[in-house]
Amino acid sequence: SEYIRQILSEYKSPKFDYLPSFTGGLVGYFSYDYLGYKEKSIRGKAKDTEDFKDVDLMLFDKVIAFDNLCQKIILIANMPLDAPETGYNKAIVELKQLRELLMHGEKKQNMGGKLLGEVTPLFDKEQYCEMVEKAKHHIKEGDIFQIVLSNRLSAPFEGSLFDTYRVLRTINPSPYMFYFSGTDVEVAGASPETLVKLENGVLHTFPLAGTRPRGTTEEEDKELEAGLLADEKELAEHNMLVDLGRNDLGKVSKFGSVKVEKLHSIERYSHVMHIGSTVRGEIRDEYDALDA
């Protein structure tokens, strides 16, 4: 964490209202296993069969941002402050090179993508049910409040993951979408949920739980919404996530600043609707994004 903080302090990109929220810096992922470095008691013993790194971050000092609303491209090049004149001239050259690449670069052919075989789960039904029973035991014993049991689905794939991601953006537009190509891993995904966000000293987390399919008509959509908001099980699960969100933000927020800004709001997406809430807090002076 301290090494990452050092990089962030040395390569801190300025913020301007007329520019995108990201103008340069670190991009990548922290795996769930990374939490074990902060919370020793929950460090996992299982081996990841895909050999994902615990942390994979890349530093970017140039950005090409596409404004979907205004349909325009913004080119950004960062410059060091220790040699402003040299840095400025270098940034101008880099911006011209980026523009030339976009205007006259070789056009990429869309390769698409397809699955070459059946989708298979990591755990079969018997193994998964065994995990459920084990989880229920730990809940009864008070070891945990809630657990998300995952089951990886795998299939052989051929083609371009980036082109597949472009299709995903079209058929399932979501608030949180990503494509990441590292040295040894390529990942794409779409999610309605942003786990945590820190901006201008304010933390937000967005609990999302409780799901129904979208209706084929507006009337059916409203009926499904009413049924979702009347479902005691769905509301209980959602309220637990809200409480956990308040508790988590409270660990790094100023006393008395944690509040529920929005509770039990229906959020609609292309295929489903969810119950969503928003929890905010003001981060303490001694903490930063890595602590959050």
Briefly describe each language-model feature range.
Residues S1-A292:
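Extended alpha-helical targeting/anchoring segments
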